[in-house]
Amino acid sequence: MGSFDLQSITSEPVLLLGLAAFALLLTALPWCFWAVSNGRSSSGVRSLLGLSNLLLTAQLVLRWWQSGHFPISNLYESLCFLAWACTLTQLLVERQWPSPLVAASATPMGLGCIAFASFALPDQLQQASPLVPALRSSWLVMHVSVIMVSYAALLVGSLLSVAVLMTDRGQQLELRSSSIGSGAFRKAVSITGETSAVGVQAAPELQLSSIDFSRSEQLDSLSYRTITVGFLLLTVGIISGAVWANEAWGSWWSWDPKETWALICWLVYAAYLHTRLSRGWQGRRPAMVASLGLVVIVVCYIGVNLLGIGLHSYGWFFDA
């Protein structure tokens, strides 16, 4: 829809459903930030997210019915699937902890995916097309869908880590607890170096940070749990991809650009989990590692695809 032809949009229900989901998320976005400033989660935001997820579900089912194959074979379909997975992950996380910070952190990701798919991609990349012979395999659903869901979980978890950094900004908070955020010993370090456990009588500037401690710990725990799920799914996705590659091309690993960046992504999040489980890190330092992972996923998924390089690329600049 590079030229944004309104007639072609209204005649194509798949594109129309995507735009409807975009409109709902766009409506929810300012509401998310208002809820953060108000300090309370909003049932209206969750309702809009739920409706957008239902619209994306209907869009994917309709494209599946139209094309006759699982709708994840081109960049438009994979972006819509990623938006669906991001909104679903966000809803599941908010069910665990209904905080406005979750919606404010994660909603822009789903919105950005749909916006890029609907307004930036050329028309030929938005249309359903027959699968190439190598993709006509039952591994398509197993490998690609698991990888995309892992990306969604890792993206949402990393965005929650960014929220940890934003919450702790300028307050020098350091969280000390178990890897799942329970039984925490939390301390604040003042500019002069004074340290106090939360809840213990201390200087006024330390007492004022108790709410931020609780918020940071919740965000940090949710980020850790979400990233753990995403990491496990990414591991399964990489292994299933290796098996599929061996069947299709006779090689378990070919150092294709997407494979290489997927490995880099796996190593970054493995380092994140290592720092938490083995080193006992929590709070800002692992959040910085997760933020690096956010950049790596964007390069792995969008950067490689748009350059049209390798067997995994959907193409754009060089072969569109």
UniProtKB/Swiss-Prot annotation:
How is this protein positioned relative to the membrane?
Answer: Multi-pass membrane protein
Name a single GO biological process: cytochrome complex assembly
> Mainly resides where?
membrane
Q: Does the keyword Thylakoid apply?
A: yes
The record's GO molecular-function terms, alphabetically, read: heme binding; heme transmembrane transporter activity
Q: Which UniProt keywords apply?
A: Cytochrome c-type biogenesis, Membrane, Thylakoid, Transmembrane, Transmembrane helix
Origin: domain of life: Bacteria
For this record, the Gene Ontology CC terms, alphabetical, are:
plasma membrane-derived thylakoid membrane
Where's it found, cell-wise? Answer: Cellular thylakoid membrane
* Spans through the membrane: 14-34, 68-88, 101-121, 146-166, 226-246, 260-277, 289-309
Q: Carries keyword Repeat? A: no
Q: How is the quaternary structure described?
A: May interact with ccs1.
Which family is it part of?
A: Belongs to the CcmF/CycK/Ccl1/NrfE/CcsA family.
Main role? Answer: Required during biogenesis of c-type cytochromes (cytochrome c6 and cytochrome f) at the step of heme attachment.
Protein's name in the database: Cytochrome c biogenesis protein CcsA
Provide the species name.
Answer: Synechococcus sp. (strain WH7803)
- Source taxonomy: Bacteria, Bacillati, Cyanobacteriota, Cyanophyceae, Synechococcales
